[in-house]
C-alpha cells in the first residue's frame, strides 16, 4: 500500500469520530493518531513528525481555521485536510485561502478521505 509510511494526525473534538478515524486509517495502513484539540495537537507535533493533518474546523478553543492560520504563519508546510460539518462555499474558500490543501465536508465516506490523503501526498511528492 502506498500510504504505509504516512503518519496522519487527526484533530477533532468529537471522541467517536476521532476513534473511528484513527482505527480506520490504521486499518488502511497509515500511522494514525487522533487528538481532541489544538493543545493536544501541539504536544503531539512537538514529539513526532506527521506527514498530514486531518483538521476539524469547529472545535472549542482554537478552531481549525485559527490552527491552519497559525501553522502557515510559522511556515509549517504539513499538508492539511479540513474535515468539517461546515460545508458551504465560504468556509471551504476561507480554509483553502488560509493554506489548507483539501476540504471534505461531513458526513463523509472514509474511503474518500483516504483517497484525498493519498492525492495530497502524491501532489507533495511531485
Report each predicted region and the residues it spans:
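Short amphipathic alpha-helix used as the core "switch/output" element in two-component signaling
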Residues: 65-76
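Active-site beta3 strand of CheY-like receiver
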Residues: 48-54, 59
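Short hydrophobic/Thr-rich beta-strand motif most characteristic of the beta2 strand and flanking loop
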Residues: 29-38, 44
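Charged docking surfaces used in two-component/phosphorelay signaling
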Residues: 19-27
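Acidic catalytic/metal-coordinating carboxylates
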Residues: 36-37, 63-66
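The feature encodes the CheY-like receiver
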Residues: 18, 60, 74, 88, ...
Amino acid at each position: 500500500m502506498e500510504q504505509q509510511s504516512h503518519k496522519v494526525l487527526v484533530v477533532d473534538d468529537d471522541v467517536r469520530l476521532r476513534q473511528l478515524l484513527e482505527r480506520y486509517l490504521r486499518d488502511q495502513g497509515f500511522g494514525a493518531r487522533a487528538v481532541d484539540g489544538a493543545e493536544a495537537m501541539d504536544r503531539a507535533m512537538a514529539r513526532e513528525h506527521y506527514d498530514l493533518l486531518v483538521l476539524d474546523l469547529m472545535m472549542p478553543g482554537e478552531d481549525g481555521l485559527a490552527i491552519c492560520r497559525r501553522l502557515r504563519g510559522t511556515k509549517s508546510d504539513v499538508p492539511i485536510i479540513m474535515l468539517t460539518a461546515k460545508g458551504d462555499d465560504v468556509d471551504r474558500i476561507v480554509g483553502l485561502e488560509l493554506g489548507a490543501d483539501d476540504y471534505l465536508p461531513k458526513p463523509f465516506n472514509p474511503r474518500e478521505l483516504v483517497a484525498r490523503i493519498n492525492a495530497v501526498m502524491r501532489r507533495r511528492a511531485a
